[in-house]
Amino acid sequence: MLDKNQLEKYNQEHLYEYEKLMSSNEKNALDEKVDQLNLAEIQDLYQDLYVNRKTIDDVSSVSEVKYEVKSRLNEEERHTYEQKGYEAIRNGEFAVLLMAGGQGTRLGYKGPKGSFEIEGTSLFELQARQLIRLKEETGHTINWYIMTSDINHKDTIEYFKQHKYFNYDANHIHFFKQDNIVALSEEGKLVLNRDGHIMETPNGNGGVFKSLKKAGYLDKMQQDHVKYIFLNNIDNVLVKVLDPLFAGFTVTQSKDITSKTIQPKDSESVGRLVNVDCKDTVLEYSELDTDIANQFNNANIGIHAFKLGFITSAVDRELPYHLAIKQLKQLDENFGVVERPTLKFELFYFDIFRYGTSFVTLQVPREEEFSPLKNKEGKDSVHTATEDLKRMDLI
């Protein structure tokens, strides 16, 4: 039985009323779930991230990151980086980590976003092709770690099976799930999903490293003598997966964190890679005043290489949550299905940067390496992604 006094203390007394409409099994399931939750922490999250939320307007401690521009590298520098990259890949120094926990909902597609196809080629296949090419060029089969979520894990694995893993060695593809966290109403109340369970949503890409560890894959990387983890996400159709030049740049620089960026456009709604108090980090566009965002020259595109030693030392350290507000379907007080603004709490992978001690960035040409697929129509859409893939002769 739910503790009514405890629920009232943390603004969750509506759950007591919900129980009156539930069967015995449903009540037991709700009781068990609520017992597992730290209601005080949930209330603190709500207060800190929603009630008292603010944007960043004091940039006195924020400066530009240390970066090099790819287009300014001479032929000798490019060749040297590429050769070092091929050598490191051949020697098994890199693992590839793909964040692919999302669905294709905003594309008008039911299924894992990575399985969305553009003229017959899925986002997963676009990346698998590049790993196959690296295998042909180096003789080494790179381990490919793919983070899914509860909402797409089974479908993702099934899609890979149906497509015979895109002719990549299935023994070198490793799937694991990110964790979840509860969602709240704008009043700070726990909500029920359409099945009558406490609604939980994926806890953001910042959980990637802990989930990787929980699955045993950080240990595997150490056993495989991996030195660097190349990280990217599923959204960017022009991503160069572990391109040898960037791999060589990473090895040569030998920093905890090596990043790729692009030159941002004014008022572009993309996070900025900046240096805060002598550490690189990403400030989300939603957390910055527009005039402040326009002061910085490196837009984050979610492509990085991390020293494995750094990740293993920092993986268990705490990261802050960030707020996202989404329209999600849920049960109302009469158990009818409604769609309402819902607070999602997300961890961001780049918050682990705060535990690093050395950083470097390579700014790359937007037109060659960045074309996000986010919408069905308009900006960053299926149309723009298709045009960019054709322009780069990728489909």
From Swiss-Prot:
InterPro entries: Nucleotide-diphossugar_trans, UDP-sugar_pyrophosphorylase, UDPGP_fam. GO terms for molecular function: uridylyltransferase activity. UTP binds at M99, A100, G101, G102, K113, Q178, G204, D235, K344. It holds the Pfam family UDPGP. Keywords: Nucleotidyltransferase, Transferase. It comes from the Bacteria. Belongs to the UDPGP type 1 family. This is Probable uridylyltransferase SERP1770. It comes from Staphylococcus epidermidis (strain ATCC 35984 / DSM 28319 / BCRC 17069 / CCUG 31568 / BM 3577 / RP62A).
